[in-house]
């Protein structure tokens, strides 16, 4: 019984370590590869990133204030392939999609509203499933 408990604790500690390591690597990836895409836009204070695998989808709701110029950046590790993303209003209507493969969009809204950023990682037929960081950054300027 003690041996089982010991292995369970060791297993849980290993999971916690690997989760913290993945988060740390994702932060470093974001700082190195994604932050420069904001250029002269001021980054908001939120860090939004996740480790995803082929076939995954994610969604993030964010408030956009009227009259402010924004840059939305979705930056992903190349191992994930051509990650798609789009902006949607509260009724689910598409406002913009990166059909051209762009990693960012610049926009300004007349009225304050909540928008959803939806991301989808393409499926892969590879025998080995790779995971990679996907970061969403929001910058603004007046």
Where are these regions (language model features)?
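Acidic, Ser/Thr/Pro-rich low-complexity intrinsically disordered segments
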Residues: 24-25, 50-129, 140-142
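N-terminal secretory signal peptides that target proteins for export/translocation
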Residues: 1-5
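Predominantly extracellular/luminal regions of secreted and cell-surface proteins
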Residues: 22-41
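A short, polar/charged loop/turn motif at coil->beta-strand junctions and beta-hairpin connectors
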Residues: 43-44, 54
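Processing junctions and N-termini across compartments
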Residues: 18-20, 28, 127
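Sec-dependent N-terminal signal peptides
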Residues: 7-18
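Eukaryotic complex-assembly/interaction regions
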Residues: 132-137
């Amino acid at each position: 019984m003690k041996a089982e408990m010991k292995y369970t604790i060791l297993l849980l500690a290993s999971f916690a370590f690997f989760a913290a390591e993945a988060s740390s690597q994702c932060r470093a990836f974001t700082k190195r590869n994604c932050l420069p895409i904001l250029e002269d836009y001021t980054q908001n204070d939120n860090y939004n990133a996740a480790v995803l695998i082929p076939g995954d989808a994610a969604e993030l709701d964010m408030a956009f204030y009227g009259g402010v110029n924004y840059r939305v950046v979705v930056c992903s590790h190349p191992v994930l392939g051509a990650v798609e993303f789009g902006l949607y209003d509260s009724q689910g209507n598409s406002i913009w999609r990166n059909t051209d493969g762009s990693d960012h969009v610049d926009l300004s809204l007349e009225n304050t509203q909540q928008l959803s950023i939806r991301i989808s990682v393409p499926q892969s037929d590879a025998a080995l499933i790779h995971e990679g960081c996907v970061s969403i950054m929001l910058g603004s300027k007046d």
